[in-house]
C-alpha cells in the first residue's frame, strides 16, 4: 500500500467513525486553524461563486462547511468505491487531495496534485484521440477548451465537436472564434437530465460562471445529450457550474453504449 493509499484509508476510517455533526465541527475547527489571509480568500471565493454555499463566520454563516460535511457523511462509501476503481496514481491522489481539502482545508496536497505538464483536461498520457473522436464541450465559453484540444491533438484528430453555451453574448464569441474550423456544431442550450426550459442566472463576477435557475429571466432551452446527439460520443468535457451530474445522467445511454 503506497503513501496515498495509506492516507486515503486513514481519512476514510476517521470520517466513517464520526456522526454528521462531529464532521461539521471538525471541519470548522480545521478552518479556524487556517491562516487569516487564506480564510479570507476562501470566503471571497465561496461567497462570489456560491458553488457550495456561503461562508461568513462573523455572521454565523457556515453553509459551505455544512454542505461538505453532509457530502462526506452521506457519500464516504461512494468515494471509497471510486478510489478503488480509479486506474492511475494521479487520479487517486487527486481524489484524496479534494476530500482532504474539504475536511482539513489542506491546500498542500491539492497543490501537489495539480498537473502542470499538460493543459487543463488534456493529459496526453491518459486521453488519446483518433480521427473518429466525437467531442462534447459543455460550457464551451469562448471556445478556449476546443482551441486547446486542437492545439494538443491537431485539427485532423476529430470527427465532430459539439459546443454548448447558454449565454447569448458569449455564444456569439464562441462561434466567431471557431468559425474557421470544420465540423463544429454550436448549440445555445443548457444540458441536464431532462428536456425543458430554464432561465439564465448571471454571475456578477464572471460570465464563465453563469448558470441556470428556476427564477424568471432570459429563457434558455435545456436538453439532454441522449436526446440531442444521435451519434456515438467519445469525450465529454463539462464545466457547467453544478449541472455536471445532471448532464451525465442525461447522457446515460451514450455512457453505457458508446464505450
Region locations from a protein language model:
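Phosphate/nucleotide-binding beta-alpha loop and adjacent structural elements of enzyme active sites
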Residues: 1-259
Amino acid at each position: 500500500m503506497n503513501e496515498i493509499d495509506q492516507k486515503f484509508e486513514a481519512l476514510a476510517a476517521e470520517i466513517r467513525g464520526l456522526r454528521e455533526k462531529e464532521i461539521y465541527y471538525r471541519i470548522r475547527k480545521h478552518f479556524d486553524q487556517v491562516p487569516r489571509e487564506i480564510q479570507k480568500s476562501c470566503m471571497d471565493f465561496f461567497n462570489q461563486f456560491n458553488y457550495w454555499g456561503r461562508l461568513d463566520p462573523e455572521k454565523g454563516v457556515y453553509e459551505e462547511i455544512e454542505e461538505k460535511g453532509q457530502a462526506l457523511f452521506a457519500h464516504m462509501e461512494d468515494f471509497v468505491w471510486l478510489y478503488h476503481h480509479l486506474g492511475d496514481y494521479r487520479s487517486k491522489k487527486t481524489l484524496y487531495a479534494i476530500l482532504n481539502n474539504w475536511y482539513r482545508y489542506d491546500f498542500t496536497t491539492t497543490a501537489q496534485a495539480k498537473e502542470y505538464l499538460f493543459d487543463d483536461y488534456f493529459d496526453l498520457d491518459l486521453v488519446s484521440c483518433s480521427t473518429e473522436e466525437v467531442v462534447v464541450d459543455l460550457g464551451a465559453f469562448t471556445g478556449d477548451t476546443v482551441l486547446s484540444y486542437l492545439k494538443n491533438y491537431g485539427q485532423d484528430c476529430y470527427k465532430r465537436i459539439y459546443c454548448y453555451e447558454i449565454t447569448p453574448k458569449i455564444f456569439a464569441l464562441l462561434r466567431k472564434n471557431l468559425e474557421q474550423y470544420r465540423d463544429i456544431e454550436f448549440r445555445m442550450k443548457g444540458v441536464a437530465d431532462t428536456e425543458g426550459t430554464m432561465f439564465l442566472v448571471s454571475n456578477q463576477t464572471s460570465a464563465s460562471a453563469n448558470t441556470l435557475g428556476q427564477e424568471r429571466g432570459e429563457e434558455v432551452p435545456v436538453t439532454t445529450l441522449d436526446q440531442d446527439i444521435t451519434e456515438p460520443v467519445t469525450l465529454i468535457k463539462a464545466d457547467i457550474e453544478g449541472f455536471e451530474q445532471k448532464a451525465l445522467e442525461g447522457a446515460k445511454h451514450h455512457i453505457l453504449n458508446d464505450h
